[in-house]
């Protein structure tokens, strides 16, 4: 039976990582319990340092319950703030704490930890939270710029109700994981997701039932693991807009092909890897009708095969990136077929398109509770239990060819 303090693991982006969580005395410190548990859901091993002011907002006992870790407030002989950590997250980061750090005032274990992390190159992320008038003050802006110049990531939310509130825990942990995991070996990834459509007339379209959820989960997972992601989205069942990603909407199959080529060839984006998780139409309308067809009309729709977009991606990447081109990963969905047929279809795509790997699944797996997909390469077939497993497999391929 799970204990009250336990959490359910959602991902592995912080697995095995020693994270120092710093809490200063802003009112946003009341969010620490939720933030700490979200860190743990992604595998983080946490140690906590609070300022005295923070203990007036939330008790060390509550923080210890949430983190299942030691909580330091006062100086002690262990000097845990100088231990080796994989990353330092300061949330909330008050102006007072930032000013002390920038100006070398070292009157608390937290400020010492910030200085030590800066000195030894440990990734640092600060999350300021304050009223707009304080945030917009020139002194605050200078402090934030200086913190960023010293290598820290500064995560600021949009203004809401006259305040820069602390972002939600899911967003904070996602950005912190990305900052912690980002290295020179990580890729600039283009992910195609969602369904495509072909116009019947000016109102109606032929489309498919793809929601885009799997593709977006892959984007989220790859971002947390340190990759930079650009999204080319077709038709989805949800709003794909997310400040972490550059998002292009192109539900039309033909325009999606043009956008994919343009994005790969865009020097500013530097795309070197493609994940083609979109359900791109195999057939499109031979010719669309103008206006709106009458509901009394008997329709005889002519559909023609649409060229496979993925067939050009390896070539586009190779021409643009040369030896720096990363892998292309395709997706293959069948219905009612056995594993042998799935593997055969996936390897046919590998041979035809030159992709490095294919995520192959049956539609019943997508809708069921069992295994999620097969990971198929030229020489390997393995089972993937869930979307997180798909992310891990793709990440391993990206880093292996980095």
Regions found by a protein language model. Name each.
Residues 1-402:
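A cross-family phosphate/adenosyl-ligand binding-site feature
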């Amino acid at each position: 039976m799970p204990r009250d303090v336990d959490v359910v693991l959602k991902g592995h982006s912080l697995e095995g990582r020693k994270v120092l969580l710093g809490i200063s005395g802003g009112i946003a410190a009341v969010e620490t319990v939720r933030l700490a548990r979200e860190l743990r859901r992604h595998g983080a091993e946490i140690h906590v340092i609070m300022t005295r002011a923070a203990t007036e907002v939330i008790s060390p006992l509550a923080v210890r319950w949430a983190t299942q870790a030691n909580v330091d407030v006062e100086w002690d002989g262990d000097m845990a703030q100088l231990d080796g950590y994989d990353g330092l997250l300061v949330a909330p980061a008050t102006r007072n704490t930032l000013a002390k750090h920038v100006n070398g005032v070292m009157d608390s274990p937290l400020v010492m930890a910030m200085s030590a992390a800066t000195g030894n190159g440990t990734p640092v992320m600060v999350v300021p939270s304050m009223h707009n008038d304080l945030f917009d003050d020139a002194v605050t802006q200078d402090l934030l710029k200086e913190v960023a110049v010293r290598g820290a990531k500064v995560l600021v939310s949009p203004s809401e109700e006259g305040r820069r509130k602390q972002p939600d825990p899911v967003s904070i942990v996602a950005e912190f994981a990305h900052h912690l995991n980002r290295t020179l070996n990580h890729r600039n990834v283009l992910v195609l997701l969602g369904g495509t459509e072909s116009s019947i007339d000016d109102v109606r379209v032929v489309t498919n039932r793809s929601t885009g959820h799997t593709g977006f989960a892959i984007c989220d997972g790859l971002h947390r693991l340190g990759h930079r992601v650009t999204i080319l989205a077709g038709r989805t069942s949800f709003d794909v807009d997310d400040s972490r990603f550059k998002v292009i909407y192109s539900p039309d199959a033909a325009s999606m092909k043009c956008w994919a080529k343009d994005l790969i060839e865009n020097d500013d984006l530097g795309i070197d890897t493609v994940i083609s998780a979109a359900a791109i139409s195999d057939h499109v309308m031979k010719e669309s009708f103008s206006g709106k067809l009458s509901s009394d009309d008997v329709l005889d729709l002519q559909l023609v095969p649409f060229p496979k977009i993925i067939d050009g991606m390896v070539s586009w990447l190779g021409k643009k990136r040369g030896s720096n081109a990363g892998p292309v990963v395709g997706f293959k969905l069948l219905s009612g077929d056995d594993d042998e047929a799935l593997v055969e279809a996936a390897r046919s795509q590998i041979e035809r398109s030159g992709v490095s790997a294919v995520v192959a699944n049956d539609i019943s797996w997508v809708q069921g509770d069992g295994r999620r997909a097969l990971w198929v390469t030229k020489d390997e077939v393995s089972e993937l239990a869930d979307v997180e497993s798909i992310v891990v497999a793709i990440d391993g391929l990206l880093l292996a060819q980095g």
